[in-house]
């Protein structure tokens, strides 16, 4: 019997629910966690405990949160925290001139940091999928030009880290 991936809610995936849905939920949760750490100053252990026990897979203020792949969520959040000093300059270079990362809204910083981390470290996920997923996450919070900016920044970073994927077509 195949081993099931653990999720933040520790429940097996319902029949027909795709791993991608749990990864998408993990990405959204990771961005929310990174945002909360950025603006609220919460620590990594506190964030993990809060999200794993109170948010994911539960109903909060009338919204049902999807279960998320725990290992993926933790990898993205802890990886961004660990590598932020390396990720931020990459994002700064990819941003339009005159728009330093510090000037970008905190939620978009979280989206771009998570996407940049995944592009550099999660080679198991195709670059185009990573970019598309984080544009979708950005769409959950903002509209219009800002999602285009996320797409442009992550596309540039993807081409830097995964040029071979783009040369194949």
Curated annotation (Swiss-Prot):
Q: Does the keyword Transcription regulation apply?
A: yes
Name the UniProt key words of this record, in alphabetical order: RNA-binding, Transcription, Transcription antitermination, Transcription regulation
What Gene Ontology terms for biological process does this UniProt record contain?
Answer: DNA-templated transcription termination; transcription antitermination
Q: Return the InterPro entries for the record.
A: NusB-like_sf, NusB_fam, NusB_RsmB_TIM44
- Gene Ontology CC annotations of this record: cytosol
Q: What Gene3D superfamilies does the record tag this protein with?
A: NusB-like
For this chain, one GO molecular function annotation is: RNA binding
Q: Where is this region: Disordered?
A: 1-22
Offer one Pfam family short name for this entry: NusB
Regions of compositional bias (Basic and acidic residues) in chain numbering: 1-19
Q: Which residues form the signal peptide?
A: none
As for what it does, the entry says: Involved in transcription antitermination. Required for transcription of ribosomal RNA (rRNA) genes. Binds specifically to the boxA antiterminator sequence of the ribosomal RNA (rrn) operons.
Output the NCBIfam families linked to this UniProt entry.
nusB
- Protein family per UniProt: Belongs to the NusB family.
HAMAP family found in the cross-reference section: NusB
Listed name of the protein: Transcription antitermination protein NusB
Provide the species name.
Rhodopseudomonas palustris (strain BisB18)
Give me the gene this protein comes from.
nusB
